[in-house]
A protein has these predicted regions:
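Acidic/polar, glycine-enriched structural segments that form the non-catalytic walls/loops
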Residues: 28-29, 35-42, 48-218
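Alpha-helical support elements that line or immediately flank enzyme active sites
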Residues: 218-228
Length: 228
């Protein structure tokens, strides 16, 4: 049984993307997340047989992170969890899974593949999307907008976008850009502005920058936002 908690783990945050990787003597498991839209993300997980012999793999997902009072309903290849107190709708779709089921009103169990044989050097790719819409937003419209997107293409476009932005940032003539310690600060500033950006929602009519995750819960600071 492949238990992630017992294996070597690395976690990386790149501009616009999260990566987690787990390794043991038989398998490499890499999962990546990037944004499709301002309301939806794609999650791509790849398991590779690193050994010299076939490996049997059963691939399951379990989760229990939703509100206990959520209203759960099934959709094509997924589940919808609506939180009654504010009508927030979280939709998770497992595009490559065999079986998806709710467990109570706050959990799920997904059978991706059972007893799948993975030959030496071969890979299996799991794909899912997560969408969060707020009160008054059209969930069906958002799901339709991402339904035809190719997950691999989205990750390729994400990489191209951020590589182009970083190249543009570092292409100036400033003497400071010749020193790696300043180049790193510049890239970190870009990553912070990206991470702290918030799209319009509720009483906030325009996108802007949330100044910090620590000690500041909601809202936007205008003197940060004009820079974005």
């Amino acid at each position: 049984q492949y238990r992630m908690v017992y294996n070597v783990q690395t976690t990386r945050y790149l501009p616009g993307k999260l990566i987690q990787e787990y390794n043991d003597e038989n398998l490499n498991f890499t999962t990546e997340l990037c944004y499709l839209t301002s309301r939806s993300v794609a999650i791509r997980s790849i398991v590779k047989n690193m050994s010299q012999k076939p490996v049997k793999v059963s691939f399951d997902w379990n989760g229990g992170v939703y509100e206990p009072t959520s209203v759960v309903s099934s959709i094509d290849k997924g589940l919808s969890f609506i939180r009654p107190k504010d009508s927030t709708n979280t939709v998770i779709r497992f595009l490559t899974a065999d079986k998806i089921q709710a467990v109570g009103s706050d959990s799920l169990h997904v059978t991706e593949k059972s007893e799948m044989t993975l030959e030496p050097g071969k890979t299996y790719q799991s794909e899912m999307t997560q969408t969060l819409t707020l009160r008054g937003e059209d969930t069906a419209k958002e799901l339709a907008a991402i339904a035809t997107l190719n997950i691999d293409n989205c990750f390729e476009l994400n990489e191209q976008q951020w590589n182009a932005q970083i190249a543009s940032l570092l292409s100036g003539n400033s003497k400071y850009l010749k020193d790696n310690k300043y180049r790193k600060v510049l890239v970190k500033a870009m990553m912070t502005l990206n991470s702290n950006y918030r799209t319009p929602a509720g009483d906030i009519l325009h996108g802007g920058s949330n100044p910090s995750y620590n000690g500041f819960i909601n809202g936007i600071w205008s003197w940060d936002s004009w820079k974005i």
